[in-house]
UniProtKB/Swiss-Prot annotation:
PANTHER family: BLR6086 PROTEIN, OPINE DEHYDROGENASE DOMAIN-CONTAINING PROTEIN. May play a role in maintaining a redox balance during environmental and functional hypoxia. A methyl group in the beta position may be critical for active site binding of the keto acid. In the reverse reaction requires NAD(H) for the activity but not NADP(H). Its EC number is 1.5.1.23. Optimum pH is 8.5 for the forward reaction, and 6.6-7.3 for the reverse reaction. The half-maximal rate is observed at 6.8 for the forward reaction, and at 5.5-7.9 for the reverse reaction. Pfam families: Octopine_DH. This is Tauropine dehydrogenase. One of its GO terms (molecular function) is tauropine dehydrogenase activity. InterPro entries: 6-PGluconate_DH-like_C_sf, 6PGD_dom2, NAD(P)-bd_dom_sf, Opine/Lysopine_DH, Opine_DH. Keywords: NAD, Oxidoreductase. Subject to substrate inhibition by pyruvate for the reverse reaction but not for the forward reaction of the tauropine dehydrogenase activity. The keyword NAD applies. Belongs to the lysopine/nopaline/octopine/opine/vitopine dehydrogenases family.
Amino acid sequence: MVVLTICGGGNAAHTLAGIASNQPNMEVRVLTLYADEAERWIKSMETNDFTTIKYATGKDPVHLKTKPKLVTKNPEQGATGADIIVITVPAFAHAQYLTALKPHVKPGTVVVGFPGQPGFDFEIMKIWGDLAKQCTVMNFVSLPWACRIKEFGKSVEVLATKDMMFGSVRNGTVAPKMDPTAMIQGCLGPLPRLECSGHLLGMSIMAVNGMLHPSIMYNRWHDWDGKPVDAPPLFYHGLSQAGADLLSDVSNETIAIAKKVMEQRQGVDLSNVIHMHPYYIGAYPDDISDKSSLYTCINTNAGFKGLTHPCTKTADGKFVPDFTGRYFGEDIPFGLAVTRGIAEIAGCPTPNIDKIIEWAQKLMGKEYLVGGKFTGKDISATRAPQRYGFNTLDSIL
């Protein structure tokens, strides 16, 4: 029997709770600290089944009717005796959960970020201290599914499941109950297939969302004349060749960071930092109709169809870009800024990453880069290694 604790109460937590509860030899608990989510979920399950509806192209939907054993707001109830803890909340909430979990986590526990986002392991090391070294940490670059809650605490829809998902593992000094990759694969079932390789630092260098979303925002809006547009532009399927080239350049800079680290520390494997083009082909093998380039991969990915730039409506019915959402608020401080902080330590120039951060920080009213150096006053609100006092390669490896 594997005891799984899921942290969070959103789309991903609902989905994992339903899917994992359907797997054999699995005790599933949900710990949600947000507002009254636990109470609402418990109340719903008193009178309703919990249904996970899985969709797949060309097949009838599959309805899984299962319930987690426990839903709670109490960290002691949720975490005591857990073999594996999966954190599904956004990066800004990780510290709250890690702090609440710490007194109740046993050495040998597997801690998983779904996705952990860049700096996940830095946050764990800072908050858990020696306990972090005794636990196995896993970080994945994305969520396994496209999913949405249909009715809170009652049903969730899995609109698409990735074929493969990439991640990395750092083994702790105390062995887990079983192989950590096999353990989390057992929670998910056969798909997505989990591929874990390379050093955990690679997951912080290869900030997929941190590269993708700010690059697309920069390409579309950096020279905007301030005039409202008639409709929100398509986000992915409106990507220009120039935008794809910028994203490719940013991706190449992350590969250069990885190579620079490996040059200085023999034996550190950062081959898990790959270009965005092969990443997309691996992540969406059946959704992309033209895989010939990064530009075509994004523009012909069926999963991106119809998605638009975040915009707000003006009084006269037109639209202006909204720079207050997660594409900046999460993907810069918990994404691209982390990558840039690692580059600073490695001594690797990143002109394209710098260009995007310098543009974004003005719109955000933040300061990360000053005169080309990663020394701004708002680094303390990021997950860059410098925020935690990690300023050498040895401290982040």
